[in-house]
């Protein structure tokens, strides 16, 4: 009985110890869960939990180092970022990068304001002092807006002028190139030009037994190339004759030697009249023999 009561008395103590051990295990598991949750945070969440303002960054730097570093005045923000490997690194942003500053709104000018500003720019490209103050008051603008507009307008004008100069230079270069090509082609044409053909009289060979006066009149002078018939041949009827060959044929085809009894006249039809005279003489001889 005593042993059973002692065991029953020890039971609650053991259960308490086991419960305490369970509590310690639970604390350990909870800490592990917290670490796991902390490891699952994104870099932006870690950056959000870190110093999110210049004052917070300076305070964290003062707490960690005890005094501001030598480059503390040149920076305005420090951000803690966890990379893909789980390493936490600190990123220091420069003072010139102001993330909290709102974006500047773009100034929109009305048509009347633009017309007036353009007229003033055509009159004078630099408006300063009292003129700028008066112009800003009339257009219901600030002096800074007027000054910036004039600066942008001068920059645009310089760009336009440089673009025009480039276009003129390119056009002049193309014109010079075209002119040089034309001159080169003309020079080539002058060098490759065919010489003029010599006169027909120089190409015509001299006929054997033909006087010089007949050569010039029968071949060179076109006025003497018209057909002329002798009185004897005109009396007798003759069939139509083919037209005379041009004088060029004499220069291309070889000339045959004519018999000594065959005399050339000034007309191209005299050979036919000579044949007619020969035929007539032969017929008269036959009649005489009969």
Curated annotation (Swiss-Prot):
SUPFAM superfamilies: Homeodomain-like. It is found in: Nucleus. One of its GO terms (cellular component) is chromatin. Residues 1-17 have a biased composition (Basic and acidic residues). The keyword Transmembrane helix does not apply. Keywords: Developmental protein, DNA-binding, Homeobox, Nucleus, Transcription, Transcription regulation, Wnt signaling pathway. It comes from the Eukaryota. Transcription factor that may function in dorsoventral specification of the forebrain. Regulates the expression of Wnt signaling antagonists including the expression of a truncated TCF7L2 isoform that cannot bind CTNNB1 and acts therefore as a potent dominant-negative Wnt antagonist. Plays a crucial role in eye development and, in particular, in the specification of the ventral optic vesicle. May be a regulator of axial polarization in the retina. This is Ventral anterior homeobox 2. It comes from Homo sapiens (Human). The gene is VAX2.
